[in-house]
């Protein structure tokens, strides 16, 4: 009798994706982040669903409904903090996943890579709209400042901003539509993730050496299911340590003050995972220029496959490129720090230098270094 998991139409898809999937035998822990992102997404959808049962998207009651969740709903506080800190874990995994792709040359799978960039944009949009929902000071002013950036678009900018707001300022209409989009987008992310996986399984996984691994494959289950479970346990442990011991570590104290359109906070800043892009935005004195730089800071990932000049796929055997990669990581950490600082000397200059360095590494130094390394190897 043929095994049902190999014949049943639905079970067959799951079997070919998670059980009998031929996987390179040498993929490291850096390949765990895909499954961790899946776990984060499921966790966010579930906690978000329970929060949505008690949340009201009205300017007069939004803040108090979040307070009500934390004070009166059974285990509401843990659901709320798991959702808030789950977003942080989501972005940590996302950035590590993208970093892995850059380091090991996974961007040569262009379809998978491009769907991944769309996923990144969608998750960022979801997180931004979610941050507006508690209707605290930083929610309100963050929404005002970021949506206002669209007014830099020539000719249609002002109309576009008012269309998004549903009025002449961030108000009830804005909050209601942000809640609607914040609810629906995670399901769009789920669908895109399935497409991401579909394209990945067309080519098979990359591996640390960058060499085709068709001659050395092992089944996904049990080897990588066990490995992924270990990763998941470490993820949940980290998340719960954050939630139970310092749930507000990554948040902003200003968001515990109800939104007040008449009082601007001294330092308006987004959540920590957007600070690097915010620093790039602020480092350009011109509004339109800043908005373009902000968009390009992520869109630049789309042209990385075109800038691949090395004869090797990954950076495993390319020490000079490795140095540049870690310089890029340090630069992004610097930008993240600068994004959270006030706009004054010396932070402005540091931010501008770090922004220039970010684009220079990706657009100029990495392709040139790859050519130099090719010549060193005399290939």
From Swiss-Prot:
Cofactor note: Binds 2 heme b groups non-covalently.
Membrane topology: Multi-pass membrane protein
Keywords, in A-Z order: Electron transport, Heme, Iron, Membrane, Metal-binding, Mitochondrion, Mitochondrion inner membrane, Respiratory chain, Transmembrane, Transmembrane helix, Transport, Ubiquinone
Binding site for heme b b562: 83, 182
Binding site for a ubiquinone: 201
Cofactor(s) for this UniProt protein: heme b
Keyword Lyase in record: no
GO biological process: mitochondrial electron transport, ubiquinol to cytochrome c
GO function terms (MF aspect): metal ion binding; ubiquinol-cytochrome-c reductase activity
One cellular component (GO) term of this entry: mitochondrial inner membrane
Matching InterPro entries: Cyt_b/b6_C (IPR005798), Cyt_b/b6_C_sf (IPR036150), Cyt_b/b6_N (IPR005797), Cytb/b6-like_sf (IPR027387), Cytochrome_b (IPR030689), Cytochrome_b_C_euk/bac (IPR048260), Cytochrome_b_N_euk/bac (IPR048259), Di-haem_cyt_TM (IPR016174)
Annotated residues for binding of heme b b566: 97, 196
Residues spanning the membrane: 33-53, 77-98, 113-133, 178-198, 226-246, 288-308, 320-340, 347-367
Any Pfam family matching the protein: Cytochrom_B_C
Cell compartments where the protein resides: Mitochondrion inner membrane
Subunit structure: The cytochrome bc1 complex contains 11 subunits: 3 respiratory subunits (MT-CYB, CYC1 and UQCRFS1), 2 core proteins (UQCRC1 and UQCRC2) and 6 low-molecular weight proteins (UQCRH/QCR6, UQCRB/QCR7, UQCRQ/QCR8, UQCR10/QCR9, UQCR11/QCR10 and a cleavage product of UQCRFS1). This cytochrome bc1 complex then forms a dimer.
Its job: Component of the ubiquinol-cytochrome c reductase complex (complex III or cytochrome b-c1 complex) that is part of the mitochondrial respiratory chain. The b-c1 complex mediates electron transfer from ubiquinol to cytochrome c. Contributes to the generation of a proton gradient across the mitochondrial membrane that is then used for ATP synthesis.
Note: Heme 1 (or BL or b562) is low-potential and absorbs at about 562 nm, and heme 2 (or BH or b566) is high-potential and absorbs at about 566 nm.
Similarity field: Belongs to the cytochrome b family.
Name of the protein in its database record: Cytochrome b
Organism for this UniProt entry: Leptonychotes weddellii
Organism classification: Eukaryota, Metazoa, Chordata, Craniata, Vertebrata
